[in-house]
């Protein structure tokens, strides 16, 4: 699932990071890849009376670096786009504009994106993975095994959403990884939510370092009490 409040703060602080002075500087684009809503949040180890929050923003990010472009997370299934609120089993999903269209608005075609890294392989992070045909997937070894060798053992994995990545080139990681070799974009291993959950450190030229923390936490309370 998607952590919400921490990501919302990042959006306020970061937005689309573009340096007006240097065309080749590192840029981070924040994209809206859907929304989830819940009638019962106890599945997140938080009781319903501990917070009034019931909706979660689903973000995707595009990192534009002089050495390549990295899509971080792929949001909800684009089949939801234009369908309004879809409700099932106490959860609703809404998705208004596909990540592919948002990437095009930034100035890239989906087939120009050359790297993809997903915080983890749950359905709300892999929805559009099949629509970026030329990416090299950067994935932790444990997550790769769970997603491609035993997806039926992981009920929130939806293999159909990322099956086209099976034959894509991959970099199988066993821990942290410097994506572009300059320390500016670092994948950090953070297992727990899934076997190979990972987070992304980005050091932006104007606003400095931040962490895109995937589903490390879902609520402020989760972070404060380490739930």
Where on the chain are the PLM-derived regions?
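Bacterial N-terminal signal peptides
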Residues: 4-13
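Active-site environment of divalent metal-dependent phosphoester hydrolases
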Residues: 37-39, 79, 121-127, 145-146, ...
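Active-site flanking residues adjacent to catalytic metal/cofactor-binding acidic residues
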Residues: 72, 119, 139-140, 192, ...
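Short, conserved loop/helix-junction motifs that constitute active-site signature segments
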Residues: 130-133
